[in-house]
């Protein structure tokens, strides 16, 4: 069994027209044993910037804390909000530093540029190799199912409501086909003037 699937979990981000969405499941378990259904996997890293972490639960929390520390230092030194691309470099550095004994988590970043409001999504592997795309990124135990749903449902230039419907359907249907993720989904829709957070009910088995 892979250490990446020990706790299970699924994270996904999608790009729309002047907006992005990031979603994650709510389950925290130890293999087949379920522990809690309100585990946080998406963390705010700025006003319009979020990171989702799928993988080993201890490393999810460790990486989130260490990243927040580095982010606070950056904002104190620079006196401005971090750009999504810069956050990606920061995460890549954090992961690559520990490449010989890595953090077992594969991050997904979604957000808008603080000045231009240009949408940005990317994913990284567990040693910090980034992949920036213009459609969607996925991470977690049901990555294959999420890719299948996203490739079927995603369209370019979706408005926020259409984007929410698409990412919700993709996420709910993907986690239904994975035994170690699910138990509800949380979705953040990031727009220029607001962030909408919705919690979706899913199968509880």
Swiss-Prot record:
Induction: Up-regulated in asthenozoospermic sperm. Pfam families: Proteasome. It is found in: Cytoplasm; Nucleus. GO terms for cellular component: cytoplasm; cytosol; extracellular exosome; nucleoplasm; nucleus; proteasome complex; proteasome core complex; proteasome core complex, beta-subunit complex. Belongs to the peptidase T1B family. The 26S proteasome consists of a 20S proteasome core and two 19S regulatory subunits. The 20S proteasome core is a barrel-shaped complex made of 28 subunits that are arranged in four stacked rings. The two outer rings are each formed by seven alpha subunits, and the two inner rings are formed by seven beta subunits. The proteolytic activity is exerted by three beta-subunits PSMB5, PSMB6 and PSMB7. Non-catalytic component of the 20S core proteasome complex involved in the proteolytic degradation of most intracellular proteins. This complex plays numerous essential roles within the cell by associating with different regulatory particles. Associated with two 19S regulatory particles, forms the 26S proteasome and thus participates in the ATP-dependent degradation of ubiquitinated proteins. PANTHER family: METALLOPROTEASE TLDD, PROTEASOME SUBUNIT BETA TYPE-3. This is Proteasome subunit beta type-3. The lineage of its organism: Eukaryota, Metazoa, Chordata, Craniata, Vertebrata. The gene is PSMB3.
């Amino acid at each position: 069994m892979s250490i990446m699937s020990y706790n299970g979990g699924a994270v996904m981000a999608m790009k729309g027209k002047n907006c992005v969405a990031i979603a994650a499941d709510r389950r925290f378990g130890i293999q087949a044993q379920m522990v809690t259904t309100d585990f946080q996997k998406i963390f705010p890293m700025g006003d319009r910037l979020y990171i989702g972490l799928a993988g080993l639960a201890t490393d999810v929390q460790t990486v989130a804390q260490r990243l927040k520390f580095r982010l606070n230092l950056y904002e104190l030194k620079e006196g401005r909000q971090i750009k999504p691309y810069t956050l990606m470099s920061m995460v890549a550095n954090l992961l690559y530093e520990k490449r010989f004994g890595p953090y077992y988590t594969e991050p997904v970043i979604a957000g808008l540029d603080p000045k231009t409001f240009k949408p940005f999504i990317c994913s990284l592997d567990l040693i910090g190799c980034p992949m920036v795309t213009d459609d969607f990124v996925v991470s977690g135990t049901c990555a294959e199912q999420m890719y299948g749903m996203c490739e079927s449902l995603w369209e370019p230039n979706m408005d926020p409501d259409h984007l929410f419907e698409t990412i919700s359907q993709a996420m709910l249907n993907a986690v239904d086909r994975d035994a170690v993720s699910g138990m509800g989904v949380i979705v953040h829709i990031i727009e220029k003037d607001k962030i909408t957070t919705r919690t979706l009910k899913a199968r509880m088995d």
